[in-house]
């Protein structure tokens, strides 16, 4: 079966089949090899990506800009000051106007509804660079990394420890679609969205994977192949940071916790890391840590998304 993603939005990975996700991962792997051997892949010559940033980012901005450059296209950075949204122009009108100038839109937003509205009114593909609900590009890079290092995704025990946030949501969705055994451990009251839990359970039933939600990090990481964490307070939650530090302290990924995982476990973090909070130096800097490979794979995974949805490559 030929899979074409041309013209598709990428808002949430629940909208994609396992086959479509694998198409992205396989394309990303191909681009990574091509880059390593110096093979040109300027598949988006003359195309432009508008990048809307309501919130700043190192990895998202740099990886998307470099991805478009490698693909022969151009990335246009637009922050809140560059747009008329603050002066009353609607997201719908912004989407309509940008669609007349560019070939795709990537948006990093606070509210997931903003990226949904962009997609509703844009006539070009819209890519979610991060919202408060999901972070699909991160999950694609994460599972690309797991596939590279473990040789498979099916049956791999992926344990997320911390806040049931956007990163957890996308990790749950993609992992259960691809047949992983996904476990999420959070403090009570900080669980993932109920809707995402149901999706994960349904996905696992279809893929042969599994999903489990726990409140005990030690029990969760037992025999883990992958331990993943993220910051305890996301951007916009600064007022809660002190309270969250107290609540999440027992969920810190440290040398005592990782003893319960498999000896060859992988430590993952979407970065930036708050060292000494959600993870200690002796874990993130250990030989088990793959965070830098994971960060690099954002470039390759997003390059695949761009080439596929902007019509540069078809399978």
Swiss-Prot record:
Q: Which residues bind carbamoyl phosphate?
A: 57-60, 84, 108, 135-138, 270-271, 298
Q: GO terms for CC?
A: cytoplasm
For molecular function, the Gene Ontology terms on record are: amino acid binding; ornithine carbamoyltransferase activity
What does the sequence similarity comment in the record state about its family?
Belongs to the aspartate/ornithine carbamoyltransferase superfamily. OTCase family.
Q: Which UniProt keywords apply?
A: Amino-acid biosynthesis, Arginine biosynthesis, Cytoplasm, Transferase
Q: Which reaction does it catalyse?
A: carbamoyl phosphate + L-ornithine = L-citrulline + phosphate + H(+)
Q: How is its activity regulated?
A: Inhibited by the bisubstrate delta-N-phosphonoacetyl-L-ornithine (PALO).
What gene codes for this chain?
argF
Write down what this protein is called.
Ornithine carbamoyltransferase, anabolic
Give the subcellular location. Answer: Cytoplasm
